[in-house]
C-alpha cells in the first residue's frame, strides 16, 4: 500500500508545482535533467527515508534565478525617466476632525451674499437663528441726557425730571430667522430670494445711578419683516449690485403715557459691494399714517430721517470701519451720523476667528433712542459685540 508523503515533502512538492507555471519561456526550455531529478525522487514511494534524502539533494543542486526581464524592456536613458504617477486615489472625505463650515459662513462668498444668503452655496436653511445687528454691551458717555422727555403731542410730555446721569450702559439684542426662500422664479437657479423676520431690542440702563435704583431709562423694541431679492448685476468700476428688498417695521418703547413712543414704517432697501472690501447699503422709508390723537411722536421723520445710507470698509479680516448717515430729506436738514469700528477679539478653540468684536462707536444727531427722537445728542461708546453668529 502506498504511504502518504510526510508533511515537509508535501509542502516542497506543492511549492514546486506552484512555481512551475510561473517560469519564463526560457526556463521551461531548460534541460529536462532538473525536471527529471525531482520526478525520480517522487518515484521513491516505497522508502520514505531515501525519498527525503533524494529531495534534499535535488533542492541543494538548484540555483535561484530572478524572473527574466521582458524582451521588450529597454534600458531607459537618464533624460527619459517617466514622470511620477498621478495619485489615482479618491479624494479624502470629511472626517469627524474636519471643520464643517455652513454656507452662510463660507468665506469664498461675499459678505452680503453670506449675510442675506443670496446664493445656494451661501444658504444656511430656514428657521435658524442668526445675528442681525451687532449684539452689544457697551459703556456710553454722552454730552447730555434727556431727563424730562417731551413730544409734539402734549399727552406725551413728562411731568417732572428724573436725575439721570450722562454715563450709562447700552445693551442691544438683535436676531433674525429666514421664514421662506425661493418664493419667486429666477432665470439663475443658483440665486435665492428669501423672506425674513427680525427683532432688535436696545436698552439704556442707568447702572451708575444708585441714588435712583439704577433703572432702565428706555428700551426700544423693533420687530420687522423683510423680503430680499438677489438683483445680481455688474456695475462700473468693479462694483456688484447684490440685492434689493422691502420691509415693514414697528418700533416702540413699550411704555405708557406720557413716555410712550412708537411708529410704523415701510421701506425699500438695496446693497452693493466691491471685492468684499467695500459695501454700500441704503434704505428709504415712509411712515404709516397715525391720527393726531394717537401719534406719540409727531414729526419724528423730520428728526430721525426718511433715508439711511451706510458705507463699510473691511481693510483686513480683523477690522471693519463703517459710517451710517440718516437724513430727513426735508426743508430742515436733520438726521444723524454714526461712525463705528469693529475689531476681532481672539480665535476660537478650532483656530478660527471668533465672532466677538471690540466695538467703538461715535453717534451724533437725533434718534439714538425713541425717547430721544427730538433731542440732539453726541454719544461715545466702547464695548463688546457679537456679530454674524
Feature roles, as predicted:
Residues 57-61, 93-252:
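Transmembrane beta-barrel domains of Gram-negative outer membranes and organellar outer membranes
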Residues 239, 247-332:
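Detector for outer-membrane/organellar transmembrane beta-barrel domains
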Residues 195-199, 225, 244-248, 280-284, ...:
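Membrane-embedded beta-strand positions of outer-membrane beta-barrel proteins
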Residues 141-145, 201-205, 229, 248-256, ...:
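Transmembrane beta-strands of outer-membrane beta-barrel pores
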Residues 167-173, 193, 217-223, 260-266, ...:
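Residues that define the transmembrane beta-barrel architecture of outer-membrane proteins
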Residues 26-69:
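Alpha-helical, heptad-rich or low-complexity scaffold/stalk segments
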Residues 222, 339-341, 360, 377-389:
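Outer-membrane beta-barrel "beta-signal"
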Amino acid at each position: 500500500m502506498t504511504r502518504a508523503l510526510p508533511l515537509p515533502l508535501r509542502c516542497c512538492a506543492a511549492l514546486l508545482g506552484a512555481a512551475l507555471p510561473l517560469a519564463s519561456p526560457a526556463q521551461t526550455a531548460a534541460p529536462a535533467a532538473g525536471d527529471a531529478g525531482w520526478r525520480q525522487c517522487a518515484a521513491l514511494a516505497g522508502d520514505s527515508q531515501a525519498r527525503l534524502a533524494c529531495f534534499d539533494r535535488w533542492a541543494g543542486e538548484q540555483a535561484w534565478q530572478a524572473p527574466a526581464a521582458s524582451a521588450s524592456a529597454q534600458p531607459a536613458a537618464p533624460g527619459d525617466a517617466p514622470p511620477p504617477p498621478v495619485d489615482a486615489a479618491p479624494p479624502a472625505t470629511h472626517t469627524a476632525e474636519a471643520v464643517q463650515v455652513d454656507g452662510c459662513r463660507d468665506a469664498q462668498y461675499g459678505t452680503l451674499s453670506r449675510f442675506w444668503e443670496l446664493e445656494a452655496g451661501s444658504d444656511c436653511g430656514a428657521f435658524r437663528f442668526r445675528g442681525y445687528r451687532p449684539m452689544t454691551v457697551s459703556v456710553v458717555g454722552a454730552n447730555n441726557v434727556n431727563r424730562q422727555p417731551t413730544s409734539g403731542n402734549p399727552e406725551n410730555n413728562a411731568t417732572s425730571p428724573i436725575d439721570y446721569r450722562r454715563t450709562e450702559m447700552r445693551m442691544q439684542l438683535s436676531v433674525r430667522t429666514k421664514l421662506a426662500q425661493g418664493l419667486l422664479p429666477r432665470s439663475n437657479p443658483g440665486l435665492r430670494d428669501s423672506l425674513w423676520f427680525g427683532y432688535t431690542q436696545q436698552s439704556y440702563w442707568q447702572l451708575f445711578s444708585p441714588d435712583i435704583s439704577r433703572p432702565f431709562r428706555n428700551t426700544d423694541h423693533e420687530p420687522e419683516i423683510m423680503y430680499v431679492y438677489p438683483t445680481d448685476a455688474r456695475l462700473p468700476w468693479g462694483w456688484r449690485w447684490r440685492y434689493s428688498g422691502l420691509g415693514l417695521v414697528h418700533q416702540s418703547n413699550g411704555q405708557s403715557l406720557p413716555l410712550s413712543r412708537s411708529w410704523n414704517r415701510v421701506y425699500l432697501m438695496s446693497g452693493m459691494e466691491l471685492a468684499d472690501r467695500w459695501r454700500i447699503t441704503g434704505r428709504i422709508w415712509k411712515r404709516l399714517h397715525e391720527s393726531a390723537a394717537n401719534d406719540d411722536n409727531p414729526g419724528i421723520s423730520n428728526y430721525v430721517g426718511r433715508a439711511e445710507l451706510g458705507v463699510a470698509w473691511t481693510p483686513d479680516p480683523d477690522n471693519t470701519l463703517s459710517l451710517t448717515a440718516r437724513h430727513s430729506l426735508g426743508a430742515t436738514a436733520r438726521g444723524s451720523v454714526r461712525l463705528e469700528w469693529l475689531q476681532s477679539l481672539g480665535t476660537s478653540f478650532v483656530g478660527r476667528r471668533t465672532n466677538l468684536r471690540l466695538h467703538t462707536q461715535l453717534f451724533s444727531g437725533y434718534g439714538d433712542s425713541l425717547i430721544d427722537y427730538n433731542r440732539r445728542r453726541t454719544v461715545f461708546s466702547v464695548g463688546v459685540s457679537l456679530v454674524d453668529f
